[in-house]
Amino acid sequence: MQTRSTAKALCQIGLLAVLITVSAMFKLPSILPGMEFQISAPIAVAICGVFGIRTYILAGLVSSAVGLLLGTQNILNVGISLLFRIAVAAVFFFSGPNRFFYLFSGPIGTFFARIALSAVVGKAAWGLVAAAVPGMVFTLLTAGFCGKVLGLARKAVLERENASVRHPLQENNVR
């Protein structure tokens, strides 16, 4: 059974990585060029809340690797997104999957990522944070909804999986 659970975990991480990667290609526009906000932020928060830190970080690493391979991200993008993920995971670690987590982990992660970005590029930190405020509000408003949707999807998959498991001694064990 270990092989089945490993294969299931690999598939789950791969699918979540694809979800992060594809949603990162959609961005909320910004007044300043280059300051767009990725739609993947609330989805990433939801993945952490529903699937836990380990799965979230692994899916994020795979997503970043895919972005590098496709050329849609560079090392700076990957570093900033990893900082966002670490901040979200830290909030999850200390608060769990509650309302506070879904409301504030995304904006906290974005805040720390923008502060780090300002240190790297040498621009005013508060200007970068101010440019991200619309995206932070978007994440604050939508992460809980994304978490509900992912939670319902996970629950349906688990119920389907449990319903399809039959015991060898059970009568009418036909598939």
Language-model features: locations:
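Loop-helix junctions at membrane interfaces
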Residues: M1-R175
